[in-house]
């Protein structure tokens, strides 16, 4: 009977376990301390110790609870842990069963922020290759911000001043608090459902880390990254930053700066337009002067080598041959007249009437033959001259132009073969009545080589 008062190890351990279970102070315990001896096996559970300078508490957090915490616990991290105290019977010790954990103090938000930033950066959400180019001349700008804050006033004022023609559509949203992230994501989704928004601005004015936190939450950062509409993120003041700044296509230091990035200043555009107009006029004037010089050179070339000049030369040659022909004809007449005079003298000397008549007849025949020969020679010379003129007319470039042909120049140089041209060359084609400028878009060479 004496031995009935002894309890087994299991029994006393079970008793102690029951004591912890029924103790209301042990059912929900709030513990603050530093993590040490952290381990996470393949099961996904966390095994660690929560300690302070006076004591330590063995702790465990099961996998289901681990999945709900928004950061990665590390040794040396100060945390706030909620859970219950129980007994691990196999080891015969009490331990803390953690059900919720969060970093301790304001530094906890920075830890959570840095850990989420590292995770999203590893996934590629901040990569420059993903970022879209902002449109140069947007017609509609969407703004996701508070409808009562200074940010929306700054954005509207700046856009209206820089480009009054741009339509601004404000999507009012709460920018801090528990529901802020959800509302921001909803508005980004609404904007992407439209097909007329060119660029959107999301952001708010300055504030503390807690007040800006909605723009650090993962759903917002991912919605910005997934947006088909280019996004400008402008959260807080110049020294502030949010994770939405990194996933956005462009980060602006302030809401005013975001508006300046979203739309151009019409005064700058007017100056640029005037400058380009001046440059275009200068280039056009230079091109016109070059064409005028080229035309003048072509005129001089035609004057020296054209059919008119050739005709004048042929006319000079005709006059020269006509003069020679007249001289030869006059000489023949003179010779015949001299012979006639001699015969006439002889006739007077001998008075042979029959001989005189015979000589007169011969003289007449000779004169007729000579006249006929001279006329035929002159006719032959004229026909030859006109044939040469016709040949010159056919060889003249202007004659080719009249028949529908064109003369092609490249940089004021005559083009004689298609092999001298390449696709993309600018050419000038001289035609009857003027010329045209053309661009070579295709080229096909004759396979025969002709």
From Swiss-Prot:
Top EC group: hydrolase
The reaction(s) annotated as catalysed by this protein in its Swiss-Prot or TrEMBL entry are:
Exonucleolytic cleavage in either 5'- to 3'- or 3'- to 5'-direction to yield nucleoside 5'-phosphates
Subcellular localization: Cytoplasm
One of this protein's GO BP terms?
DNA catabolic process
* Keywords, comma-separated and alphabetical: Cytoplasm, Exonuclease, Hydrolase, Nuclease
In its keyword annotation, does this UniProt entry include Endoplasmic reticulum? no
Per its UniProt record, what InterPro entries does this chain match?
A: Exonuc_VII_L, Exonuc_VII_lsu_C, OB-fold_nuc-bd_dom
List the CDD domains: ExoVII_LU_OBF
Q: What is its EC number?
A: 3.1.11.6
Instruction: Tell me the superkingdom of the source.
Output: Bacteria
Q: Transmembrane stretches, by residue range?
A: none
What does the record give under GO molecular function? exodeoxyribonuclease VII activity; nucleic acid binding
Chain's role: Bidirectionally degrades single-stranded DNA into large acid-insoluble oligonucleotides, which are then degraded further into small acid-soluble oligonucleotides.
PANTHER family this protein is in? EXODEOXYRIBONUCLEASE 7 LARGE SUBUNIT
Annotated family: Belongs to the XseA family.
Protein name stated in the entry: Exodeoxyribonuclease 7 large subunit
């Amino acid at each position: 009977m004496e031995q009935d008062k002894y309890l087994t190890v299991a029994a006393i351990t079970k008793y102690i376990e029951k004591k912890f279970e029924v103790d209301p102070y042990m059912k929900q315990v709030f513990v603050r301390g530093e993590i040490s001896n952290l381990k996470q096996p393949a099961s996904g559970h966390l095994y660690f110790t929560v300690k302070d300078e006076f004591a330590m508490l063995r702790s465990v957090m099961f996998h289901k609870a681990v999945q709900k915490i928004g950061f990665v616990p590390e040794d040396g991290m100060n945390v706030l842990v909620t859970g219950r105290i129980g007994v691990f019977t196999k080891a015969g010790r009490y331990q803390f069963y953690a059900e919720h954990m969060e970093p301790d103090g304001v530094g906890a938000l920075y830890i959570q922020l840095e850990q989420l930033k590292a995770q999203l950066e590893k996934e590629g959400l901040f990569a420059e290759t993903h970022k879209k180019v902002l449109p140069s001349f947007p017609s509609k700008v969407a703004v996701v911000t508070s409808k009562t804050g200074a940010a929306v006033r700054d954005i509207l004022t700046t856009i209206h001043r820089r480009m009054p023609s741009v339509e601004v559509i404000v999507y009012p949203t709460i920018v801090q608090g528990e529901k802020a992230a959800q509302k921001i994501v909803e508005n980004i989704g609404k904007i992407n459902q439209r097909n007329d928004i060119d660029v959107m601005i999301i952001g708010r004015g300055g504030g503390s880390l807690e007040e800006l936190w909605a723009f650090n939450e993962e759903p917002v950062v991912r919605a910005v990254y997934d947006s088909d509409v280019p996004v400008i993120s402008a959260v807080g003041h110049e020294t502030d930053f949010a994770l939405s700044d990194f996933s956005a296509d462009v980060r602006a230091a302030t809401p005013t700066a975001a508006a300046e990035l979203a739309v151009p200043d019409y005064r700058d555009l007017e100056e640029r337009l005037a400058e380009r107009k001046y440059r275009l006029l200068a280039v056009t004037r230079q091109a016109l002067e070059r064409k005028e010089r080229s035309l003048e050179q072509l005129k001089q070339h035609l004057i020296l080598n054209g059919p008119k000049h050739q005709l004048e030369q042929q006319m000079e040659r005709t006059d020269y041959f006509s003069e020679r022909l007249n001289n030869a004809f006059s000489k023949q007449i003179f010779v015949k007249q001299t012979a006639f005079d001699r015969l006439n003298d002889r006739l007077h000397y001998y008075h042979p009437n029959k001989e005189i008549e015979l000589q007169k007849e011969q003289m007449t025949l000779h004169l007729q033959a000579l006249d006929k020969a001279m006329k035929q020679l002159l006719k032959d010379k004229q026909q030859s001259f006109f044939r040469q003129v016709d040949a010159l007319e056919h060889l003249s470039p202007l004659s080719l132009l009249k028949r529908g042909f064109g003369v092609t120049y490249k940089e004021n140089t005559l083009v004689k073969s298609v092999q001298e041209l390449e696709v993309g060359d600018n050419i000038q084609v001289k035609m009857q009545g003027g010329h045209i400028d053309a661009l070579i878009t295709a080229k096909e060479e004759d396979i025969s080589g002709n």
